[in-house]
Each structure stands twice: as structure tokens, then as C-alpha cells.
Amino acid sequence: VSEEEASRIKRGFENSFLLPYPKKEAVVTISLKDVYHKVNASLTHEIIPNDILIHQRGTNHITPHRYLLQNGNAADCIDVAIMAEGYTEKEMDIFYKDAQTACDALFSHEPFKKLKEKFNIVAVASPSEDSGVSIPGQGKWKSTAVSSHFNTFYSDRYLTTSRVKSIHNWLAGIPYEHIIILANTDTYG
């Protein structure tokens, strides 16, 4: 971490690892390596498929979504999810229009243009309570799907979210390998 803030503040960040749900007990080990491939830290976790504390998602209550581009099944294509952030239920038609604009813009450039037939793009209508995104530097806090905000690392236009679990919960049951969070703001961030 090269930001100045990292020299004075220690912080933890959510992370998610997507893997097939095991049919029988499995052991998963995650290792963090340095630039010399030396393991600095590792975590081992046993997964017991019938554990009552595992919340299986993606079978019920799947977030409403619409394919903007569908060139094949999920196994054969690169699946990109475009998530709504800062769009209320009433603004979902605007979100779908904005998502189509983003999709069209992506495929107007190489190498995406020549590889368009290898992609599926799905717009995911993750509703927010408030319209727009938070701007802490102006004292504006919004209740949104994944709690995104400007002023990350105290930079005015640095827009991000730390709610990685929320992102994946909204996308549960929808095929994706890559995620674009489309924020309802006119500010470039």
C-alpha cells in the first residue's frame, strides 16, 4: 500500500473467495505470499457442506437482473455483472439505460470490440434506499446497496466501497467473473 495514509493507519478489508460448493467435506487453505513467493500468512478452513451456520445464497431471492449482451452460456463466456449503486427502485429504468450505455462504450474499444462475442453482460438491479453516493468531504452520507463513497484515502474523486461481502450477496445466483459497480453520480471517480 503506497498511500500516505497506510503509514499511519492500520486497517482490515473484507475479501471473498469464490469456489464451487463442495459435495463433501473439504479443506481450503489461503496463503498470502510476498514478492519473493515466501508465505507471510495463511488461513486454513474446513468446509462441512451440511453445517447449519453456512448461509447458502443464490438459490432464492436472486436480485432482479437483465442481460444486456448474451453470447452463450456462462461456462463458455466471460460473464460481467454491472451492479446498480445509488439507484433507488424508482430509478431502475435509468440504471438499465446507463448500464447499456456503459456496455456499448466498453465494446466500442479494442480488444473488447473484436472479442465481443466472448462476453455476457448482465445488469443487476441492486436497489439503494437513497439516490446517489456518499460524499463524506461534504458531509453527505447515503444509504446505498454497497455503501460506496468518495474521499477514499482523502482523495476527492476516489470512489470505492469496502463492502465486498455485500457485493457478492447481491450477485449470488447470477453468473459472473468480473464486476462493474455503476454509481449514480455525475462526478468522475
Question: Which residues does each PLM region occupy?
Answer:
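Beta-strand-enriched, solvent-exposed domains that form extended recognition/catalytic surfaces
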Residues: V1-H55
